[in-house]
Amino acid sequence: MSEIELEPGADPERAERARKLFSGPIAFLKSAPALQHLPVPSVPEIAFAGRSNVGKSSLLNALTNRNGLARTSVTPGRTQELNYFDVGEPPVFRLVDMPGYGFAKAPKDVVRKWRFLINDYLRGRQVLKRTLVLIDSRHGIKDVDRDVLEMLDTAAVSYRLVLTKADKIKASALADVHAATEAEARKHPAAHPEVIATSSEKGMGIAELRTAVLEAVEL
């Protein structure tokens, strides 16, 4: 088996560039609790969004091959900041860890602040090339996810759906949720038509996701 498992039609040169970039320098840049704290928009950005407990921190750690890059909050919904990570030295692009959504126990004012921060970020960030919206394979797309997809559609931000925890369900169930998620993607004008299934624990889909990130930032 080759070191990098490629999807059909994938560009092997881009896949190798992705492997090297994500194996190289990656560093935390800053946390931005409000728009005025965002870094200078000097390089392309890829944002990661998802419900609380969707496995976003684990996926970011697997993607960057680092155990402690993204830390999991003890209390879902507590962190209301955009966390920036530089990829490359000097930075070639940035990963943006968006605060989780769909937190049942969060106060209403926290939810409102989240919507304002994310909505303003999505609408005004020209260097944002794509948002990766993470969906738990075990649960599929929920109404709160659809709300975020509509927010992205309205802001005309290109996004792609990524299934997480794909190793936690049977192959037949994964095939069903993958098909249902792609069917949902086709309903949304700003969504990429293809869905990537991943497992942070098993490494499934990680090479494909790295390549998709490079494709989105046009490297």
Swiss-Prot record:
GTP binds at residues 50-57, 77-81, 97-100, 164-167, 198-200. Pfam families: MMR_HSR1. The keyword Cell inner membrane does not apply. Residues 42-219 form the EngB-type G domain. One of its GO terms (biological process) is division septum assembly. Mg(2+) binds at residues 57, 79. InterPro entries: G_ENGB_dom (IPR030393), GTP-bd (IPR006073), GTP-bd_ribosome_bio_YsxC (IPR019987), P-loop_NTPase (IPR027417). GO terms for molecular function: GTP binding; metal ion binding. One of its GO terms (cellular component) is cytosol. Keywords: Cell cycle, Cell division, GTP-binding, Magnesium, Metal-binding, Nucleotide-binding, Septation. Its cofactor is Mg(2+). Gene3D superfamilies: P-loop containing nucleotide triphosphate hydrolases (3.40.50.300). Belongs to the TRAFAC class TrmE-Era-EngA-EngB-Septin-like GTPase superfamily. EngB GTPase family. Necessary for normal cell division and for the maintenance of normal septation. This is Probable GTP-binding protein EngB. It comes from Sphingopyxis alaskensis (strain DSM 13593 / LMG 18877 / RB2256) (Sphingomonas alaskensis). The gene is engB.
